[in-house]
Amino acid sequence: MPELPEVEVTRRGIEPFVAGRRVERVDVRTAMLRWPVPAGLAEQLRAREVLAVERRGKYLLFEVDAGWFIVHLGMTGTLRVLPAAGVPVAAKHDHIDWIFDEFVLRFRDPRRFGAVLWHPREAGDVHAHPLLASLGVEPFSPAFTGALLHARTRGRTVSVKQALLAGDMVVGVGNIYASESLFRAGIRPTTAAGKVSLPRYERLADAVRATLADAIERGGSTLRDFVGSNGESGYFQLDCFVYDRAGQPCRVCGTPVRQIVQGQRSTYFCPTCQR
């Protein structure tokens, strides 16, 4: 599933092409995604100029003068920028095209867990949308601190890894990045969130930012389907300290990496480096 780094890589790849350009038309071939594509979306966007492309958590927010169209990539979704001249014929899983003058922005999603929604400007700020309003803080914002994590976890018995994954404290820390961040911070993922001290949470906040920044720099992680807007795979997964390295020696101390299951998801950690 594309997480924050993959969505941010997509945003950075798309924005230079679409910002300041007008949508000539929208072709919706499959309306039944995770939620139905709004029936009037094509008409709402016709001849509209894209003002900006923002990311909130794992959502992409395309702003036009009349509102925002919101895209979520789901588990297998991608957005590709294709030249209008000679654009490939749409395949089975190519559900939506936004046609501009010189290129096509194509949404592909084999499993159809992604979404394309519309938020009109008269409904208020897009960040008040029900899917966005309850999200945690952005990991690169000044609001994301060790003090925030410490305050929000007092008395909580859930594991620190599961607390990170929940998304109500900080957004975008998916399974890979939670394991990697906890390794960098030296925190065992099974530790109760409420038992982690303030200094350790300060290290964790720094580790989350560093891990996500490294992943974005490497184009995200491609475990199965993800490619960026240019069709290239990410390669962060090749440099992971612990994720998907069960039984292999820790890159720091040489102890075999352990794999456990938490909340039906695989967790990887070093029993020596993480306490």
Curated annotation (Swiss-Prot):
Cofactor: how bound: Binds 1 zinc ion per subunit.
Binding site for DNA: 93, 111, 156
Active site, UniProt feature: 2-3, 58, 265
Any one GO biological process: base-excision repair
SMART domains for this protein: Fapy_DNA_glyco (SM00898), H2TH (SM01232)
Gene3D superfamilies referenced in this protein's UniProt entry, alphabetically: 1.10.8.50, MutM-like, N-terminal
Cofactor section: Zn(2+)
PANTHER family in UniProt: FORMAMIDOPYRIMIDINE-DNA GLYCOSYLASE
Protein name: Formamidopyrimidine-DNA glycosylase
